[in-house]
Amino acid sequence: MAAITKLINLYFSDRLREIDYFREHPAEVQERQFRYLLANGAKTEFGRDLGMKGIATQQQFRDRIPIYDYETISEFIDRTRRGERHVLWPEEAKWFAKSSGTTGSKSKYIPVTLAGMRKSHMRGPKDIMALYCHLYPKTSVVNGKMLTLGGSKRIEREGDNMMSGDLSAILIENTPAIANILRIPDKKTALIPDFDEKVRLISEQSTRQDVRSFTGVPSWNLVMLNRVLEYTGKENILEIWPHMELFVHGGMDFRPYQAQYRKIIPSPDMHYMETY
């Protein structure tokens, strides 16, 4: 095992123990999270209106808290976008993930707090790498670059210190500097809104790098990989990146794309890791 992989496993050892605890005690961990959400929800106007402070059990939560659609709580979200705090969550939300509006004509704005990014969106990739290195201790994936294909919605200013955009663009904008050393393309290229231009620049940048993993939605990544093949004139991805070994994917069913990926990445050592 490479020295860097040993260091990675050592660095993530505490987190791996936490993940093992989640597996062994799922009900306890979920109850703890339930209490955390209730305690913070009770500090908000939304939670006070629904009497969250008086909720003691999950059954009481189900009985008292109705199911809301976006339109029902849009007024609360609009107030959050204007900078009000303690409306839906105690922490101020300065970032808003902008959806494509699939269930209506207007885009939807999902508040994203810094704590939410740190405890979920930023922790998730670390957990993936920790689990992968644990499952495959002889991996060399950390010795190369990870190629990421983010969204194409431009980051827009919503007002004083408020920003909105595609969730992946928000995460790229807030990624720690050290992570950018291990990832391509550079932030400027990753945030280009025009998909064709972005893929062209990725093709130019990535073919000169030692890419060993990539991540994103299967459909768009397949388009990107085929563009890279066209750009280089190669038959398959291994001719460009011989050490490619991992695709971390999510967002849609991977099964319709499996055969196409195996065709352009004909390696028995290639791993596909789905996230949810």
Model-predicted regions and their roles:
Residues 1-29, 34-276:
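Active-site phosphate/ATP/adenylate-binding loop shared across adenylate-forming ligases
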